[in-house]
Amino acid sequence: MNRSKNIDSIIDILGENKAIDILKIDVKKLTSTVDFMIIASGTSTRHIRGLSEITIAEAKKNKLMSIGVEGQDGSDWILIDFGDFLVHLMLPKVREFYNIEKLWGFESVDINHSREL
């Protein structure tokens, strides 16, 4: 599976598992460390942990291995590193506070399922 399909597959998995405000950001021109970031919110720490576990398990089925995971133990922000793209899973209040979309030069937007910037 190519990178674009991997990213789309993860976005689909997040949507199917009730993640909210899913956003894909192209950061290739802003950093040399990753090409894309997927940002999504969950309704509780249990929900974002479940989202992270499902994302990692489904990625493995497609032979996509995560390099690392930060914040899985009861955190309100979990980061999954897939090498050339990252997945940020956060509680809405944490996402609003850190507003990493704006930090990377993008304005926050309200979306129903997914949106690409």
Regions found by a protein language model. Give the residues of each.
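Polybasic/polar functional segments that serve as interface/processing modules
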Residues: M1-T33, T45-I78, P92-K93, I100, ...
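Short hydrophobic/aromatic beta-strand micro-patches
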Residues: I39-S41
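Active-site beta-strand termini and strand-to-loop segments that position acidic
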Residues: I80-F82
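Catalytic metal-binding acidic patch
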Residues: D35-M37
